[in-house]
Curated annotation (Swiss-Prot):
Record's keyword terms, sorted: Ribonucleoprotein, Ribosomal protein
Entry's family note: Belongs to the bacterial ribosomal protein bL27 family.
Protein name: Large ribosomal subunit protein bL27
Cellular component, GO, one term: cytosolic large ribosomal subunit
HAMAP family attached to this UniProt entry: Ribosomal_bL27
Region annotation (Disordered) ranges: 1-25
UniProt organism field: Synechococcus sp. (strain RCC307)
Length: 87
């Protein structure tokens, strides 16, 4: 008989680091060209006028200006779009 209890094993004990996704600049905020507006996985928010999209779907400003969000109606559902109005 064992005098000590065996340690056993578990399949838990792992977690990934947070990816800091979300909106970084809100509507009405002034931004400079290259500023990151939204970090996202997939295109939950679409790029509008003066907004570029990175290969990881990050949206960023192409010009200096003011951020504004708008809702656009598609055939199946409503989508959000972010634009930058030049100053």
């Amino acid at each position: 008989m064992a005098h000590k209890k065996g340690t056993g094993s578990t399949r838990n004990g792992r977690d990934s680091n947070a990816k800091r996704l979300g909106v970084k600049r809100y509507g009405g905020e002034k931004v400079t060209a290259g500023s990151i507006l939204i970090r996202q996985r997939g295109t939950s928010v679409l790029p509008g006028v003066n907004v570029g999209q990175g290969k990881d779907d990050t949206l960023f400003a192409l010009v200096d200006g003011v951020v504004n969000f708008e809702t656009i109606r598609r055939a199946t559902r409503e989508r959000k779009r972010v634009c930058v109005t030049p100053l």
